[in-house]
Amino acid sequence: MRESFDVVILGCGEAGIFAAYELEKLKPGVKLLAIDQGPDIYHRSCPIVSGKVRECIHCPICHTMCGFGGAGAFSDGKFNFTTAFGGWLTDFMPEKEVMELIDYVDSLNVKHGATTETFSTFTPEALALKKRALEHDLHLLSAKVKHLGTEKNLQILTNIYEHIADKHTFRFNTAVTAIQAEPDGRYSVVTEQGEVYTADYLIAAPGRSGAEWFANQCKDLGLELLNNQVDIGVRVELPAL
């Protein structure tokens, strides 16, 4: 089987979802295919969460990591309004533009069910703590934050999926084995089932679970790879005062 599309997106995490959302908005009627090795939003179920097992049994396809919504689908949904941490987009565009995009994404989340309530660490108490931290050469980063909550996070993703599901073609539970550059400048992807999909544009957003696979694909395509810096977070819990 061989089928042609305008755009093929690999991965239905946040990057893939919003790419599909924006393409439909900016180019209505675009012929778009989104592929993910996990299930749709309705059928993601971890056996630990459902109470079937007590510890990870290493499912061939992890429903916590894969499927519509990506690895963040079952998170508590914290949305940070800052460029101080969480990425390096300011290396490629002005900070003002990045903040406008952050606000825009938030508006889409609100449109699909997110709360409008935000929390801020720009408080006298936080400023005092920041001053104390500096005395020990520790730099406390402040930001406005929105807490979506796990259940609301899933509902937002479900609403977004239902908004775009009938506008694009989705292939869930489908693993891509190879990305190929065609002589005419187009791209083709080959699935585990032997299906071939070609496209004028390819957006690869395989997420954390597909990072190693994608790195190998890039090497096969002759693309240069750069090491990304890693943020290490430490969670410190203190007794309530």
Where are these regions (language model features)?
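Dinucleotide-binding Rossmann-like beta1-alpha1 core, especially the glycine-rich loop
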Residues: G67-F119
